[in-house]
Amino acid sequence: MKRVILFLITNLAVMLVLSATLRILGLDRFITAEGLNLNALLMFSLVVGFTGSFISLLISKPMAKYSTGAQVIDPNAPRSQREAWLLDTVYQLADRAGIGRPEVAIYEGAPNAFATGAFKNDALVAVSTGLLESMREEEVAAVLGHEVAHIANGDMVTLTLIQGVVNTFVVFLARVVGYFVDRTIFRTERGVGPGYYVTVIVCEIVFGVLASIIVAWFSRQREYRADAGAAQLLGAREPMIHALARLGGLEPGDLPKSFQASGIAGGGAISALFSSHPPIPARIAALQQMRLS
């Protein structure tokens, strides 16, 4: 699938701006004279949490094009045989998957590819020049099948919903902890003091890191599905296995983190817990064990 710094940065930026805006407008009235209004806080957290993730989803295509410098191929006037082949291959895969034909783009970079877009029938599949130059056609077709499977499986929307849920918990818990720290440690009796805001910021960072582990785990499960989807679309497991094996011997290109989850290669995460992609040997083993329908 591809899905976690551009998506997360955009998501976090929207959350922060929205939080500040709601406070300026006086719409964050979950702290009252009687204490913390948990129902009001939950509603506030839902608005902030889901708005950030959905705005990130809606602008994912233009942000992907901008951040990678991807050039969309004109379907009516491909400039080379390679571009014509890419269009034809992606369109065939999309037709088999039962989705609208996505935009197809090429960007300069080391081996990688990604898919993004808010809707199945209005998506983008992009592949790097490094991948095109280092893989055989059947392997490139498998990678394209993997990306089309991400779109068909609705992985960007799934990631957005998961991100919205974890955002909500991060916003909610950070403010609950901030309130109690401000009351019990800093002894604030009326309203909230500096301790509340400092605690909220620290908790949002800490809880955000923990939440990213959950998002990464879901992303890894969707990667297995996309690998299997590529095999189903191609009618054989071998092209996807060969593509992964070749990718394992290459230095995959970094993507903006927001698109790593929908890329073919991992994002080079420090720990497996934070990786959006399973290890390549595990992905190959899963493909070898699957049954084609």
Curated annotation (Swiss-Prot):
Named cofactor requirement(s): Zn(2+)
BP-aspect Gene Ontology terms: proteolysis
Subcellular location: Cell inner membrane
Cofactor note: Binds 1 zinc ion per subunit.
EC number: 3.4.24.-
Membrane topology: Multi-pass membrane protein
UniProt family annotation: Belongs to the peptidase M48B family.
Name of this chain's protein: Protease HtpX homolog
Protein source organism: Bordetella avium (strain 197N)
